Design a protein with these regions (language model features):
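A short, structured loop/turn motif at beta-sheet edges
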Residues: 1, 23-28, 59-63
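Charged, amphipathic alpha-helical segments
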Residues: 30-43
Length: 83
């Protein structure tokens, strides 16, 4: 079974996966990457109004086979903005 590596970027730091996990296909890797994004966002809430979280998936040869991103945008409602 192929091994995939999930590198994460939270807007401030890149964490490279050196262990990886064995999955049946790139499609299964896509599902795992999508599941990881909400956890990344929860662990590193945006300091400002917007932040993008990225999971890059590499195969055993080191080639990026897919990339998933989640952007969190925080906007204050017009009635609640400071004057």
């Amino acid at each position: 079974m192929p091994r995939y590596f999930f590198d994460t970027y939270d807007g401030n730091r890149l964490i490279s996966d050196s262990e990886g996990i064995e999955l049946q296909s790139v499609e299964m890797a896509r599902i795992e990457a999508q599941k990881a994004l909400p956890d990344l966002a929860r662990d590193a809430l945006p300091d400002g109004n917007q932040k993008t979280f990225i999971v890059s998936v590499r195969d055993e040869a080191g080639q990026v086979v897919l990339r998933a991103a989640l952007t969190v945008i925080v906007e204050t409602a017009p009635d609640n903005r400071s004057a």
